[in-house]
């Protein structure tokens, strides 16, 4: 993988570049009938108090709504930027909290830029490419758990060939720098810092012992020579977004786990394994990490079941650094983006999840048992019903349960081959479902659909492109644009204000676009204007007041159809009026991803991943993914 590949391409785009499928791009067949009849381009769709939950949703122009109500945001929006640093509004400041390679424990050396950090310390420092994060208050201490999604091998390996490790030591360093960091932070006279001698500090990486739980645990397809029980895995891979349970545990989400596997031999010929490999994108080459060359666990010819042990949501107790993380197979095996958990009115736990790949699906899991504050929660995520979303053109939808009766698969098979189960029940293909967020002040949820350049595009044979399971990615109401390079955010309200209900109404909160260079569908929805242009919404959190914080991971060329968008950014959205304003811009080449708040909400922590600019140390230094802490100058609440 080249430096340009690593920094500018998503996992889907990398697959498309290196494992191309024939296609013809037909940009003239943009289906705007679905747009015009629903008013997506006339006004943002708002759930009004008078809208029937399963009936027609009210159409409210953002200009009209904003005329009735002044902006709720306590900041002046900033302009798009193209430089190599972070920008925030006037009256706000930012500081670096921690960067890749910074020590987490006493006695660990400071980052050595010339050596890209020492191998011996790579399991004792802050990992690379920060992503989802959550803050926990534990006995008065503020503890952040944060993901490290992947590595830029050309940056963190001194010895490499074409960004590939050349020996087992290099592979081990890469494995150490990924996973999860748990760290205590505190605010002092000089701002925020990591408490290096905290008992909570911990690194979890690609070799940390894990326990497998739920319906897939112990299944033959999870058994290996090293683990004949199929219940004890090593490591958590490609940790993308995050979640937080009501009982105070951290949920880290395994996304593009397929990229770590490969072989110099032939792929397994077993029909079940081969079909699963194809559905999840496991091939001989992987993403050029070359783990399989130096670590037999990742060689699928030698350990063909190992990929089945990854692709899950992992539960971690941040209060106990000696606890064993648990892979919760009941929540399905997909390319998990994040996990948004909420308690239903009857006490059952609901978890929403997106599968981040073109044409994949949106999921919901509802626990069998009820959450009782102070009760035993150790098995709450082991038994429940996993469902997948069907979006109808009349702006209603249904969660379809993935049961043995509905799919013809066993419970264990559903947990291991979740995508196959979802295809069997006719789930709606989506434009790469990313983060899901649940509004804490209104019974509704949102999902970022980041982009899909293959939506509605034809192959050489004249058929519509499909996902890896053969499901056609035709234009549909919730994904209404062909060759969608901008993305959109879908919102739904469950029937009866109950997230455990199987029925919901939906609309599109925003369709990103560029009205300065495009017309029609590609101009975006009415709440997009020259002052808030963005593409590829990815990360998303909703704060305690209901403000939607949208983070992007898209094209930052600032040219052509992306002119005026600048670097990746974070925007604030009002769910009532549809107003969206730009709050932060990241350095060139970086994704803005991961967000949490201090206990008093006077500090916002934001992740800056894979900067191409020499951020944050300046010219001549290696770019380092970092967490920045943002405050208001008057120390009031952020936002």
Residue ranges and their predicted role:
Residues 27-51:
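N-terminal secretory signal peptides and thylakoid transit peptides that target proteins
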Residues 23-35, 55-90:
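C-terminal segment of N-terminal export signals and the immediately downstream linker at the start
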Residues 168-176, 191-203, 360-421, 425-428, ...:
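Beta-propeller fold recognition
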Residues 1-36, 58:
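N-terminal secretory signal peptides
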Residues 71-246, 252-256, 268-272, 276, ...:
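Long, well-ordered hydrophobic secondary-structure segments characteristic of membrane-embedded
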Residues 85-99, 107-121, 190-230, 316-334, ...:
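Blade-edge beta-strand/turn elements of extracellular beta-propeller
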Residues 120-134, 228-241, 424-435, 525-541, ...:
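Signature of short aromatic-glycine-proline-rich micro-motifs recurring in repeat-based ectodomains
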Residues 528-575:
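Loop/turn-rich, solvent-exposed surfaces of beta-rich toroidal or solenoidal domains
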């Amino acid at each position: 993988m080249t430096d340009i590949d690593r920094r500018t391409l998503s996992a889907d785009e990398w697959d498309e570049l290196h494992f191309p499928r024939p296609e013809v791009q037909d940009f003239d067949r943009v289906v705007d009938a679905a747009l015009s009849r629903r008013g997506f381009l006339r006004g943002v769709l708002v759930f009004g108090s008078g809208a029937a939950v399963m009936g027609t949703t009210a159409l409210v122009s953002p200009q009209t709504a904003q005329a009735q109500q002044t902006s709720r945001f306590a900041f002046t929006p900033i302009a798009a930027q193209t430089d190599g640093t972070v920008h925030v509004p006037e009256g706000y400041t930012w500081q670096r909290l921690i960067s890749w390679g910074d020590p987490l424990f006493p006695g660990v050396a400071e980052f050595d830029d010339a050596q890209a950090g020492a191998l011996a310390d790579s399991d004792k420092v802050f990992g690379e490419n920060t992503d989802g994060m959550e803050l926990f208050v534990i006995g008065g201490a503020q503890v952040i758990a944060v993901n490290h999604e992947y590595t830029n091998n050309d940056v963190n390996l001194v010895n490499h060939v074409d960004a590939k490790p050349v020996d087992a030591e290099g592979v081990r360093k890469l494995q150490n720098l990924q996973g999860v960091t748990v760290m205590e932070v505190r605010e002092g006279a000089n701002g925020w810092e990591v408490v290096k001698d905290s008992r909570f500090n911990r690194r979890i990486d690609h070799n940390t012992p894990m326990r497998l739980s739920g319906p897939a645990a112990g299944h033959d397809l999870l058994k290996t020579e090293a683990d004949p029980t199929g219940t004890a895995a090593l490591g958590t891979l490609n940790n993308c977004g995050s979640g937080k349970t009501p009982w105070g545990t951290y949920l880290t989400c395994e996304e593009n786990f397929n990229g770590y596997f490969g072989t110099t031999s032939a792929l397994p010929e077993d029909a079940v394994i081969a079909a699963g490999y194809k559905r999840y994108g496991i091939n001989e080459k992987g993403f050029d990490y070359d783990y399989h060359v130096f670590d037999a666990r990742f060689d699928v010819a030698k350990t063909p079941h190992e990929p089945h042990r990854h692709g899950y949501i992992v539960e971690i107790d941040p209060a106990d650094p000696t606890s064993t993380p648990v892979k919760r197979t009941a929540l399905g095996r997909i390319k998990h983006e994040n996990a948004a958990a909420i308690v239903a009115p009857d006490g059952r736990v609901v978890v929403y999840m997106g599968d981040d790949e073109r044409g994949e699906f949106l999921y919901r899991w509802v626990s069998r048992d009820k959450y009782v504050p102070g009760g035993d929660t150790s098995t709450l995520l082991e038994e429940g019903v996993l469902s997948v979303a069907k979006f109808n053109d009349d702006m209603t939808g249904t969660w379809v349960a993935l049961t043995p009766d509905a799919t013809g698969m066993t419970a264990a098979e559903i947990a291991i081959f979740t995508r196959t189960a979802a295809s069997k029940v006719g789930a709606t293909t989506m434009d790469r479902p990313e983060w899901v967020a649940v509004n804490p002040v209104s019974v509704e949820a949102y999902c970022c659909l980041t982009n899909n350049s293959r939506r509605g595009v034809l192959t050489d044979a004249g058929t519509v492109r499909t996902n890896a399971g053969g499901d056609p990615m035709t234009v549909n109401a919730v994904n209404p644009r062909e060759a969608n390079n901008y993305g959109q955010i879908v919102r739904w309200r469950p029937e009866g204000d109950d997230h455990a209900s199987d029925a919901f109404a939906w609309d599109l909160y925003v369709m990103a676009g560029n009205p300065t260079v495009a017309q029609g569908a590609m101009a975006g929805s009415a709440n997009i204007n020259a002052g808030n242009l963005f593409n590829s919404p990815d990360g998303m959190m909703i704060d305690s007041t209901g403000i939607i914080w949208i983070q992007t991971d898209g094209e930052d060329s600032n040219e052509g159809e992306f002119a005026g968008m600048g670097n990746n950014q974070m925007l604030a959205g009002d769910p009532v009026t549809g107003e969206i304003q730009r709050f932060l811009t990241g350095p060139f080449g970086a994704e803005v991803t991961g967000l949490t708040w201090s206990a008093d909400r006077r500090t916002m922590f934001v992740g800056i991943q894979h900067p191409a600019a020499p951020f944050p140390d300046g010219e001549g230094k290696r770019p380092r993914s970092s967490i920045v802490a943002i405050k208001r100058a008057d120390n009031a609440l952020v936002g």
